[in-house]
Amino acid sequence: MRMMLRVSIPVEAGNAAVKAGTLGSTIERILADLKPEAAYFFADDDGNRSGSIVFDLKDSSQVPAIAEPWFLAFNAKVSLRPVMNPQDLATAGPSIGKAAQQHGK
C-alpha cells in the first residue's frame, strides 16, 4: 500500500546533527533502507526540518522498523497515512461512485 510518511525533526536535534556532520548521512541511510518512491524535504510551519516520504508498505508489521530510525536518530515526530496517485484514484473511481449511490443524499 502506498503510504506517506511525514517526519518532523525538532530544531535542537536537527542542529545537533548538522553540527556533528551526520544529518545528511543519517537521512540517506534511513532512506536507503526504506527505498521510497519519492522524498521531499522542507521547513514545516513550526520551523522544524521536515520531510514527506512516499513508499510502499507491504505489511503493517513494518511500521516500527520505518518509524523507529527517525525516533532514535532525531527524536522526530512521525505520522503515516495511506495516499493515492492519479492512477490509484482512477482505479478507485467506480467504488467512489457506488458509495455515492448507496450512501449519498
Put a short name on every predicted segment.
Residues 1-105:
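Conserved, structured core segments of small domains
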